[in-house]
């Protein structure tokens, strides 16, 4: 038996297929989902989701949201998602370096918070291609 996984963003369905295993970046840490998992509703953090399908692992960067698990169906609603295979490692590394400077140069509390969120996104993108 497998898991039916749907990843939905405001503008498109990013993934709608079966998987054998799923690892989610929940707000309390990494969360592993296998078949016949107990029903669950959880908040998702910025991070990397990994799913195993056909014996291979596929990575996606998720930009916060929610996941519902029920009867081997996982619905993920998130603000944004990007498949790891579509991310260029050198571009992701350059973006991380640029955002790190923005965090250091942030003058106001608002700028610091915004730059820190962008830093978390950049780290997740780089982690997805690693």
Curated annotation (Swiss-Prot):
It comes from the Eukaryota. GO terms for cellular component: chloroplast thylakoid membrane; proton-transporting ATP synthase complex. Keywords: ATP synthesis, CF(1), Chloroplast, Hydrogen ion transport, Ion transport, Membrane, Plastid, Thylakoid, Transport. It is a peripheral membrane protein. It is found in: Plastid, Chloroplast thylakoid membrane. F-type ATPases have 2 components, CF(1) - the catalytic core - and CF(0) - the membrane proton channel. CF(1) has five subunits: alpha(3), beta(3), gamma(1), delta(1), epsilon(1). CF(0) has three main subunits: a, b and c. This is ATP synthase epsilon chain, chloroplastic. It comes from Emiliania huxleyi. The gene is atpE.
